[in-house]
């Protein structure tokens, strides 16, 4: 009932915009698709954890709510502040209609239409730190990476298989065993189930390093080098059997806290919905409920999707 009410309120532009404006003011959040807890994590990581043994890469920076706290924290850290390193900020910088919800309650509401370029907005928001940010505008599948070691890889760009394969192929080879951190910002989001299959595939190389509360972000430490044949493979739905899907999601569900269980469970349902296998999706949804996963958050979202013809 509560989740249904929240969804209805979101459909009112005025109510949703007012709520988002008050929420950001109260929590002192930057405008973006990140929570205050995520923004705080990036700042603390930059200040306290970064060691200077590799580059910092932000895949999917949008309006800078990941980039800005990262740089603010890093500038308090001599390993970054006394170096010539920059944060590499990747984005298409092309506006899509679904972004309007995150812009609600700001001067950006209604400013951009589908297909507009907003890189100047990013530059305006990050101008204080411009000399420590290198903007990589465009399709990361085409831009790629230069090959330098990466110490911190923030991934908010695995929105489909092509992008996921590009991140694995172009960025994972530059991770440093025992040093690198990978933060998956969509790990606990229903739409991106391939993240779970890939992290399970690479489970011998990554160690779970925690999660960011009140967010969809989960953190991994890179421990062992991934075999070249695994990095160069072109993954797809067809790459995995149903048994492997079960194993991958059992792995993920055992990693995360109770807070994130409904969203990870929803991603498993979405694995089948993405392939138009509705009966399998419905059966999986029922199985997850029988396992005691609460019907809330993203699991409620996929329930509504299953109820639509």
Give short role names for the model-derived ranges.
Residues 50-308:
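S-adenosylmethionine/decaboxylated-SAM
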């Amino acid at each position: 009932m509560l989740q249904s009410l929240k969804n209805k309120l979101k459909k009112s532009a005025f109510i949703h915009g007012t709520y988002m404006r008050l929420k950001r003011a109260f929590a002192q959040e930057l405008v973006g698709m990140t929570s205050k807890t995520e923004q705080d994590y990036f700042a603390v990581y930059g200040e306290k954890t970064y060691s200077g043994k590799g580059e910092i890469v932000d895949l999917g920076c949008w309006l800078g709510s990941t980039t800005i706290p990262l740089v603010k924290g890093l500038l308090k850290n001599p390993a970054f502040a006394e170096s010539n390193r920059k944060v590499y900020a990747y984005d298409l910088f092309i506006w899509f209609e679904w972004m309007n919800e995150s812009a609600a309650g700001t001067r950006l509401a209604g400013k951009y239409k589908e297909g507009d370029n907003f890189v100047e907005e990013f530059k305006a928001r990050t101008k204080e730190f411009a000399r420590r940010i290198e903007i990589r505008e465009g399709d990361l599948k085409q831009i790629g990476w230069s090959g330098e070691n990466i110490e911190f890889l923030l991934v908010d760009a695995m929105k489909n298989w092509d992008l996921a394969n590009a991140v694995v192929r172009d960025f994972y080879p530059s991770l440093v065993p025992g040093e690198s951190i990978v933060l998956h910002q969509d790990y606990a989001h229903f739409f991106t189930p391939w993240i779970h299959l890939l992290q399970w595939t690479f489970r011998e190389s990554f160690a779970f390093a925690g999660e960011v509360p009140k967010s969809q972000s989960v953190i991994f430490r890179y421990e062992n080098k991934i075999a070249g044949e695994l990095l160069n493979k072109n993954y797809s739905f067809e790459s995995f059997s149903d048994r492997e899907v079960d194993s991958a999601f059992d792995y993920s569900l055992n990693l995360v806290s109770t807070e994130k269980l409904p969203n990870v469970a929803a991603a498993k349902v979405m694995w089948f919905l993405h392939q138009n296998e509705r009966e399998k999706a419905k059966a999986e949804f029922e199985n997850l409920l029988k396992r005691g996963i609460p019907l809330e958050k993203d699991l409620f979202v996929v329930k509504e999707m299953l109820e639509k013809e």
